Swiss-Prot record:
Name of this protein: Translation factor GUF1 homolog, mitochondrial
Note: This protein may be expected to contain an N-terminal transit peptide but none has been predicted.
EC number: 3.6.5.-
CDD domains: lepA_C
Pfam families according to UniProt: EFG_C, EFG_III, GTP_EFTU, LepA_C
């Protein structure tokens, strides 16, 4: 007896063979009430035939490597992932449905045997044999993915959720049902990109935790405090070091949150975050009020013209000064009282109302219709399996896997291997859309292939020729491509992302130079503090270089270049944003890469003016480079005033673009780019005196005093917030460090001082002194804008046994150079252990020694065995020992402790 299922199976195979032989073209799929599938397109060659629901339905999957298993599954129940292919005159049904009455189901419900299908039905063209372009656009195949209901009561079709006109509100993405395969469907008007900004210890990470909890981005069992602070150093120190991007779903909205650091050493992370956001949450500690970093953040937000949501945190504390802080915000920042939110991030109080404000106040990303793919890189890191991972913001278009892209700045081409979102772990997807913050992997293995602020465009739109690189303008295309997710059509004949591109008439022949397509550069801070890093063991020099390369990839403000020291061997001259930044880098090298390091004394960039006629040719060739331009450096006239020039450049000079260790924060270069320029009358801003200039952070590059006409040191605008009762202590400390008073502001019971301070004076322990004299209530921050002022500086040389230790040389002002030199000599005496020979430690300026200390040698009692005899025997032994000590003094080497520089210069992380 032949079973019914065998007959049905044979019938299915017969239908399949018959349909494959008559393969012609794909048509649209819809549901028809109470019946089955049919094709509504006219002229379908007999495809108006309807099939009863109790019939046998078969599923076809294209490109499958496991056809046998899927075939059996399709016969027995359902093939929910298959795509229906209708051919002229015949068609292949999609599902195998059982009799509703035999299954005991309600007649008004239609369910599948097997797992339930939750995705809409899609029909995709195959190998260019699709419908004409006009039919595929809008109401044709895959335009909206809309299905007519198939139930007797107008309900959803069997196994398919109700899908009513899911149009994408983002014309900039040209969204459609087929966007490359798997990107989540969401209107781009529902995307919100924002960051959380605040002074240190104001509760940014705690608020980010509440965001993750309330949006259910992280499961409760995996949740922990400071979840986004994934580095062990961040958890130990209780601070945020790196910006973190995370994607969250809130109702029908997509939140792209960027958690930023609060310490001013990592202010460059804040500036990069602002470049890719449309709004920001300004978080204020309810127990401390407005602090110094709050002022800098507010000014930076105004520069970027971002929407600001003021939020007062920690309202659950008894010491919260809510009314007082509100008054300060109204008077100082000119907020409206109704705009200020009160929350407790610890207990999630008021966070839901903050969500509503984010939705209503922060605008969605700018949308551009019919645009090609373009994105900007604002962060990156290294993965040992995938190589360099780029964190990008998509400015235009859609990006899918296996797409060829072009990097404008580096002029390199690569193929995208993986795209996805940060949730906060990497979650791959099929495509990313306009306005998204996502990651891409291009299988890059070299850390210097792509840099921060790089612009990525689709390779299809770049037309290369022998002389210049031009880009086809795609803003205007013939016809409306509303049904295409991203066709990427160019007049160069490049195929679309999905199938062959239909012929499209271009209404413009305008071509754009490639440089004009580059996005606005992300703010990247240049290092202001420099020091040398050496490995304790020479065998680890290569490992140290590899570690620095990977750290530079993850930290745009960090720079380094090779350097060699006679006493410490091969090393690297590195640039940082402050001593905390230096401390973090050193600790990460030790923990993540297992390399023990020695760090030299920190220094800053100095502008040196030398005598053009007096300097010899050899020294000129070593220091001078024509790439350096003094016009890019803001020099204060006469060493007074703030020296701020409207026309001075905010970027680095031409010579500092290589990321070398001696690059200044604003408009400088170093020994490699330490060039020269003559002061002239047409220099913008305050004109420096005429002469030969170069810039360096290496004190040993400064020649003898008879060659030098002047040394200029960097000054920065410093803001200090303190209670009124401590203001005299603050002013005394600032004047002691050669600060120039600018102005004072009063905010209720607090005072804000503005000083121009020498950068070298505030780097070492200045914040500790501020905290000490204000009993912990004071705070300090400084701007990255640098002004150079001429100062009476002296080069201090440290000698050990008549040998100059280059790594210990430093510059000091004439008011305190003797005090600093004597202090270093005394500390060296305490740190260096006694040797078999005499150790003499000296400090001097030029040929004049002004401080000296001696460490007596270890002596053996050579006369212990002399129990009598002539005195000449005893004297002979002592003279022989003394002669040996003198010989050892001339040829012996003093061992310096590896942690000498940290203790010597009191290098505490600010």
């Amino acid at each position: 007896m032949i079973h019914a299922w065998a007959i049905k199976r044979a019938l299915c195979i017969f239908i399949l063979i018959n349909c494959v032989l008559k393969l012609e073209r794909s048509l649209k799929v819809t549901w028809k009430s109470k019946r089955g599938f049919h094709t509504p397109v006219d002229g379908a060659n007999g495809c108006e035939r309807e099939w009863k629901r109790r019939g046998v339905f078969f599923s076809i999957r294209r490109g499958s490597n496991r056809k046998a298993a899927r075939l059996r599954k399709a016969f027995r129940g359902v093939g929910t992932g298959g795509r229906p292919l209708f051919r002229g005159g015949k068609f292949i049904p999609l599902f195998l449905l059982r009799d509703c009455q035999r299954s005991g189901l309600n007649e008004n419900q239609y369910k599948l045997t097997g797992r339930r299908c939750s995705s809409r039905l899609e029909v995709a063209p195959r190998r260019g044999n699709g419908l004409p372009f006009e039919r595929r656009s809008g109401g044709a195949i895959g335009a909206t993915g809309q299905l007519e209901d198939g139930g007797p009561d107008g309900g959803s079709p069997p196994g398919v959720q109700a899908n009513t006109s899911r149009r994408s509100h983002s014309s900039g993405c040209s969204s459609s049902g087929s966007d490359g395969g798997g990107a989540p469907e969401h209107p781009q008007q529902n995307v919100r990109n924002f960051c959380i900004l605040a002074h240190i210890d104001s509760g940014k990470s705690t608020l980010a935790d509440r965001f993750l909890e309330l949006t259910k981005t992280i499961k409760k069992k995996k949740m922990q405090d400071q979840f986004l602070d994934m580095m062990s150093l961040e958890r130990e120190k209780g601070i945020t070091i790196k910006l973190k991007a995370v994607r969250m779903n809130y109702q029908n909205y997509i939140f792209n949150l960027i958690d930023t650091p609060g310490h001013f050493d990592f202010y460059h992370e804040v500036k990069r975050s602002l470049s890719v956001c449309e709004g920001a949450i300004l978080l204020i500690d309810g127990s401390k009020g407005i602090q110094s970093q709050t002022l800098n953040i507010f000014l930076e937000l105004q520069k970027h013209n971002l929407k600001i949501i003021p939020v007062i945190n920690k309202i659950d504390l008894n010491v919260c000064r809510l009314d007082e802080i509100e008054t300060d915000l109204l008077s100082k920042f000119h907020f409206m009282k109704k705009d200020i939110l009160h929350i407790s991030a610890k207990y999630a109080q008021g966070v839901e109302s903050l969500f509503q404000r984010i939705v209503s106040d922060i605008p969605c990303p700018a949308i551009k219709s019919n645009a090609f793919f373009r994105a900007i890189v604002f962060d990156s890191f290294y993965d040992q399996y995938k190589g360099v991972i780029l964190i990008i913001k998509v400015l235009n278009g859609v990006l899918t896997k296996k797409t060829e892209v072009f990097f404008i700045q580096s002029e390199k081409t690569s193929i995208i291997q993986e795209v996805g979102y940060l949730t906060p772990d990497m979650k791959p997807t099929e495509s990313i859309r306009q306005g998204d913050i996502a990651y891409v992997s291009c299988n890059m293995r070299k850390c210097d292939d792509v840099q921060i602020s790089e612009t990525i465009v689709s390779r299809d739109i770049v037309k290369m020729n022998a002389h210049r690189k031009l880009v086809v303008d795609l803003d205007r295309l013939g016809g409306e491509r509303t049904g295409e997710a991203h066709t990427n059509v160019t007049r160069c004949g490049v195929e679309s992302l999905r199938g062959a591109a239909p012929p499209v008439e271009m209404h413009t022949e305008r071509e754009i130079h490639l440089e004009q397509m580059a996005a606005s550069k992300v703010d990247v801070s240049y290092p202001v503090v420099f020091c040398n890093i050496y490995s304790v063991s020479d065998k680890q020099a290569n490992e140290l270089e590899a570690a620095l390369n990977k750290l530079k990839l993850n930290d745009a403000s960090f720079s380094f270049k090779p350097d060699v020291c006679e006493t410490l061997g091969k090393g690297f001259k590195c640039g940082f944003n402050g001593l905390l930044h230096l401390n973090i880098i050193q600790e990460r090298i030790k923990r993540e890469y297992g390399v023990e390091t020695i760090v030299t004394a920190p220094s800053v960039n100095y502008l040196v003016r030398v005598k053009e006629r007096g300097i010899d040719k050899q020294l000129r060739e070593r220091l001078v480079d024509a790439r350096f331009d003094i016009a890019h450096v803001n020099v204060a006239a006469g060493g007074s005033g703030d020296g701020r020039a409207d026309g001075s450049a905010d970027g680095s000079a031409d010579g500092s673009a290589d990321g070398s260790g001696d690059s200044s924060a604003h408009g400088s270069s170093d020994r490699r780019g330490a060039g020269c320029a003559r002061g002239s009358d047409d220099i913008i801003g305050n004109n420096p005196p005429e002469g030969l200039y170069y810039m360096t952070s290496n004190v040993n590059d400064i020649p003898q005093k008879n060659y030098v006409q002047g040394i200029y040191e960097p000054y920065v605008r410093t803001s200090i917030v303190t209670p009124e009762e401590y203001q005299k202590h603050i002013m005394a400390e600032c004047f002691q460090r050669r600060g120039i008073f600018i102005k004072k502001e009063n905010i209720n019971s607090h005072v804000i001082f503005h000083f121009d301070m020498p950068l070298s004076e505030i780097l070492i322990n200045f914040l500790d002194q501020i905290k000490s004299c204000t009993k912990g209530y004071g705070s300090m921050s400084y701007e990255s804008y640098i002004t150079y002022r001429e100062s009476d500086l002296h080069k201090i040389n440290i000698y050990v046994n008549n040998r100059s230790i280059d790594s210990l040389s430093f510059l000091a002002h004439k008011l305190n150079y003797q005090e600093k030199g004597k202090r270093i000599v005394l500390k060296l005496k305490e740190m260096i252990k006694p040797h078999q020979f005499l150790v003499v430690i000296q400090a001097g300026v030029g040929t004049r020694i002004f401080a000296s200390e001696r460490i007596n040698p270890i002596r053996k009692n050579v006369t212990a065995k002399c129990y009598g005899g002539d005195i000449t025997r005893r004297r002979k032994l002592l003279e022989k020992q003394s002669a040996g000590k003198k010989k050892m003094f001339s040829i012996g080497k003093v061992k310096l402790p590896p942690n000498m520089f940290t203790k010597l210069f009191d290098l505490k992380a600010q």
